[in-house]
Amino acid sequence: MNYPYEDFLDLFFSTHTDPLATAASTSSNGYSLNDLDIDWDCDFRDVIESIMGDEGAMMEPESEAVPMLHDQEGLCNSASTGLSVADGVSFGEPKTDESKGLRLVHLLVAAADASTGANKSRELTRVILARLKDLVSPGDRTNMERLAAHFTNGLSKLLERDSVLCPQQHRDDVYDQADVISAFELLQNMSPYVNFGYLTATQAILEAVKYERRIHIVDYDINEGVQWASLMQALVSRNTGPSAQHLRITALSRATNGKKSVAAVQETGRRLTAFADSIGQPFSYQHCKLDTNAFSTSSLKLVRGEAVVINCMLHLPRFSHQTPSSVISFLSEAKTLNPKLVTLVHEEVGLMGNQGFLYRFMDLLHQFSAIFDSLEAGLSIANPARGFVERVFIGPWVANWLTRITANDAEVESFASWPQWLETNGFKPLEVSFTNRCQAKLLLSLFNDGFRVEELGQNGLVLGWKSRRLVSASFWASCQTNQ
């Protein structure tokens, strides 16, 4: 990324950036920061959206401007946000939060570009990150400052991880499991982000197995298994006769995720078994340990007459990182089981491999800015619970995503097109029911008005915050399955 040298130093070392001085930085397209009329009292994510628009002044001269995702229009010039792109617009009396917020976005993008761009420089990256750490902390008073702190920490971890001199010094933040679960539960109460996928997938499963006596769910990444308690309760409530439906869950774990992951899957099984016993749900649980990321149906215990359901939650908060090759191996093998239903839930982050790391970084910043805005609408930044969730949960979540988007372009490209992959590899879409759509909308009614749900074709639903898509759920079956 090319910054005029003197202007970048002013941006970097100043404790109060004058927008008029910063406006001297002009792109090769003739746009300058003076063209941006920004009201930081409104949603700060719109600054990122303005950078991602065709008029953005942040991209390298030789690269294409980052396009808007999902064919969304009007984001950069929304009258409701006070942000517009026009020639000759002058800044009024600068506000501290406005100047600092804009400067933080510049520095974050500069750090990302310096860490992976054509002119990659570890020393420049280190210096920019050191400056960012001076400017922000996770306990700051604005959304932008706190979000910048989490991205700064995530970029710092990447820098440490890639260090040739001292790779052993890199350590991930480790929090007590009870704190992590508490933070996760708080997030569920603050936002529909997680429960949206759980709810829509569970409803689709209930509908698909309505007349089946034995149900076998193969769960790609079970985590704490919180999704299945509600499914058990629903099965019990409708099983009024003597022949109750039997539920069996097979949870996968991988040696590549370490002993802690294996132990967590086993503990999840104990909790689910105890819960099933307490409500009278016939239940069995198997733990399938994989030595590698490759999956084979021969490792499963299959029972004649069971309706097989494949549950695939990808890269949601608290879910382990799995490579595209691991997901492809799982879904390819799962197809041979002729599953009654495949549920696929994933975050709507634009990860087109051919766009490069900087594009992916900007889109990730865009994604989390929308998440922070949605949290602010439901729980003030001054609330201690909000800080707890950010520290224990959201910070590691940001860091994990930054790790994913640094993968090579060919690998990253797979993340963006799972529905397309399913449709071209022997799976057929299953239509979302009217009941499922209504339940999703009912869930959103419990939260702030900024959340929305839209249909994704005939077989999917998308959770969004204002103009930004956050999470999608889609439903499939093997082409050989008779519905």
UniProtKB/Swiss-Prot annotation:
Residues 184-251 are annotated as: VHIID. The keyword Transcription applies. Expressed in seedlings, roots, leaves and flowers. Its main location: nucleus. GO terms for biological process: regulation of DNA-templated transcription. Probable transcription factor involved in plant development. This is Scarecrow-like protein 26. The gene is SCL26.
